[in-house]
């Protein structure tokens, strides 16, 4: 974690923490670090539907033009759309303006290298070092060497064509309900599934700049649950504001999370001989039931720290092709370089159609342990990792569990929160364990 970069780029309240001035510097210095060996480097910029997107885009573009870049504005597009197009169009870098699932007042900036992958910790550290130098010593081209900016709104269609090619077959006879969170997938998801011959019902597809993630999308799947039952759909697919997450809903209205989707898809891909080394990469937040279900299918697992970037790093390092998070960041590395909600949706519907089963039948093969996650708002989230009393209560609870459950306490990567999570055999035990730890965290960490 750096001064500006969190686990998923630079984030903050737009025009307060993430100001146009900061966005200009991020564009100028970030663009330089990623493109310094190139004359007239090509950089793609996309954004979600937040009202602050235009403001930050203008500042970012100015920063990139000041180092002589050729900027191509993609308009409203998902984060994985930017990632895919950056690589497909041989650009030197891609930039996405979004705060993902966060509320509308927040926004963020994340970079992709020319290979379509997110930046390494070392690259982010170099950008931060240059931003904090007392004097800006970067080149300042003038005249014909200044950067250029063009619109490339056709990029969304190029990404749509790519997605359609990942479907194993058409989706005739499947009724899909979509919730696009009034976000970046609003203009593309309906076309995608209609073009694949699914019957489509939609909600959350009317962005107005202020309603992104507001009671809809992957962080509010209960809205889609009701919609699926109302429309008698076979499956519900909920995306977040920037389209890099997927949470599903079965035909009965039950929520199917990222762990379950990973398990369902991994089992199918293994049966097809397409799961590399019969291994799935997940984070420490994945449910114990997920690992037990994988073991039953003789699928191995690798665990990483929380954050899809760490999942991707592990996948790249050892050549695995399926990974993700319980939160719905799912990575299918044979097709794209980052979490992709629309791609994940296609993989899941592929599996659903090939199986001949309902989604509830597929999801029920994985028995989840009861899990409770409580977020505690604190003044300094990082102190939790060294606090002696917090450590002591965690140790006490783990002894009580006696190996039949687990505890996870960690600072959020993107918000001023400490996350306290417990898994146990019963919901009552989860409540008891989490309450005991949260009480100590609140007392010790200066909870707001």
Curated annotation (Swiss-Prot):
The note on the cofactor says:
Binds 1 Mg(2+) ion per subunit.
Q: Magnesium: present as a keyword of the record?
A: yes
Q: Name one GO molecular function term.
A: phosphomannomutase activity
Q: Which reaction(s) are listed as its catalytic activity?
A: alpha-D-glucosamine 1-phosphate = D-glucosamine 6-phosphate
Describe how it is modified after translation.
Activated by phosphorylation.
- Function in brief: Catalyzes the conversion of glucosamine-6-phosphate to glucosamine-1-phosphate.
Q: Quote the protein name from its UniProt record.
A: Phosphoglucosamine mutase
- Gene source species: Bacillus velezensis (strain DSM 23117 / BGSC 10A6 / LMG 26770 / FZB42)
Q: Which gene encodes it?
A: glmM
């Amino acid at each position: 974690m750096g001064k500006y970069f969190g686990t998923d780029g630079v984030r903050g309240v737009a025009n307060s923490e993430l100001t146009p001035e900061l966005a200009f510097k991020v564009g100028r210095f970030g663009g330089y670090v990623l493109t310094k060996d190139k004359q007239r480097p090509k950089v793609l910029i996309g954004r979600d539907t937040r009202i602050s997107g235009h403001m930050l885009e203008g500042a970012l573009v100015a920063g990139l033009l000041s180092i002589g870049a050729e900027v191509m504005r993609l308009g409203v597009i998902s984060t994985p759309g930017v990632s895919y197009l950056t690589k497909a169009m041989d650009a030197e870098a891609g930039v996405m303006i979004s705060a993902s699932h966060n509320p509308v007042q927040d926004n963020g900036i994340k970079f992709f290298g020319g290979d379509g992958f997110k930046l390494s910790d070392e690259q982010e550290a170099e950008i931060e070092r240059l931003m904090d130098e007392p004097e800006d010593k970067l080149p300042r081209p003038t005249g014909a060497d200044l950067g250029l900016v063009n619109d490339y709104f056709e990029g969304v269609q190029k990404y749509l064509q790519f997605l359609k090619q990942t479907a194993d077959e058409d989706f005739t006879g499947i009724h899909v309900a979509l919730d696009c969170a009034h976000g970046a997938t609003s203009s593309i998801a309906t076309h995608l599934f209609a073009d694949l011959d699914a019957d489509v019902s939609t909600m959350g597809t009317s962005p107005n700049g202020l309603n992104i993630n507001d009671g809809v999308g992957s962080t509010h799947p209960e809205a889609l649950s009701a919609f699926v039952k109302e429309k008698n759909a076979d499956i519900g697919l909920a995306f977040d504001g920037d389209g890099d997450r997927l949470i599903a809903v079965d035909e009965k209205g039950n929520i199917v999370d990222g762990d379950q989707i990973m398990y369902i898809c991994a089992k199918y891909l293994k049966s097809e001989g397409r799961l590399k080394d019969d291994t799935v990469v997940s984070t420490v937040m994945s449910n114990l039931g997920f690992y037990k279900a994988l073991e039953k299918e003789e699928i191995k697992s690798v665990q990483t720290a929380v954050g899809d970037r760490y999942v991707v790093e592990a996948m790249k390092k050892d050549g695995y092709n399926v990974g993700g998070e319980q939160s719905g960041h799912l990575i299918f590395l044979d097709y794209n370089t980052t979490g992709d909600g629309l791609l994940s949706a296609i993989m899941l519907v592929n599996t659903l159609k090939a199986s001949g089963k309902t989604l509830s039948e597929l999801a029920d093969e994985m028995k989840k342990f009861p899990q409770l996650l409580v977020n505690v708002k604190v003044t300094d989230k990082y102190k939790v990792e060294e606090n002696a009393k917090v450590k002591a209560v965690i140790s006490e609870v783990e002894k009580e569990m006696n190996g039949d459950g687990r505890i996870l306490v960690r600072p959020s990567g993107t918000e001023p929160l400490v996350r306290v999570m417990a898994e146990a055999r019963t919901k009552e035990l989860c409540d008891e364990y989490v309450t005991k730890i949260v009480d100590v965290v609140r007392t010790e960490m200066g909870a707001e």
